[in-house]
Amino acid sequence: MRFAVGVVLAVFCAFACAQDLEREERLAQETLATLVVGDPIRLDQKGGHRFLGLYTRAANERGAVVIAHGRGWSPDYDLYGELRTRLADVGYSTLAIQMPVLPGTAKIGDYLSTFTDSDERFALAVAWLRAKGGRRVAIVSHSLGATMANHYLIYNKTPDVDAWVMISIINGLQDMFRIKVPVLDVFGSNDWSVTRFGGDERLAQIRKIAGSKQVVVTGAEHFFEGHREELTRSIVSFLDAALPAK
């Protein structure tokens, strides 16, 4: 998937694949109905839409993290619920945000039309954490959420983040010379083929960025079932190095 081609596809998809705001709100209400840990917030976009975020404050904060989920999910779904609470437990306050969703029949390529919207959501989430006093802010993103974060870090002139964790990203990286913060690329040895096959290319690119590394979790699949403690350890080890106390 190339972003140059993606621009053309996105123009087409803007007409064929409008965001499903009703589905997004249903996901939000389902999330709120079962929420146990964290505080819900709403962030206001320029067009008037208000999207959900789940803020979990760390008792002894070492940094703050924006968490972005994969295609069609929600900020407390499965892996994302575990990550936002596990990271908060070890000192990283988390803001897990609702990313744009399309109708359930949409394919991954259809989501190219939502990347401008996801850029705005990342910017609002980072600004919100900064306003809460976050001095060191990272993005932790999974699957399509990682692809969206890649786009944000490339095309936003002032992304205002200090590190990026991409978990099981679903394509190769583009224009990495634009990214100036340490990057962790982590995926499973039994991950989706589109993630595994791009691993060598990603490693070659992130080696050019100081403080970056790649971790392959042996035996893990795309959602890291049975390997989430290992995943969390890898993320925390990276964040501790990339976001040193000041």
PLM features: what roles do these ranges have?
Residues 19-59:
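N-terminal cap/lid segment of alpha/beta-hydrolase-fold proteins
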Residues 50, 56-90, 95-96:
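Short, surface-exposed "cap/lid" segments of acyl-processing enzymes
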Residues 80, 181, 194-205:
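Short alpha-helix in the alpha/beta-hydrolase fold that links the catalytic acid
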Residues 108-132:
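Alpha/beta-hydrolase active-site loop
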Residues 140-149:
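Gly/Ala-rich beta-loop-alpha elbow adjacent to hydrolase catalytic centers
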Residues 179, 185-187:
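Short beta-strand/loop motif that positions the catalytic acidic residue
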Residues 189-195, 222-223:
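Acidic catalytic loop of the alpha/beta-hydrolase fold
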Residues 206-223:
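Catalytic histidine neighborhood in serine/cysteine hydrolases
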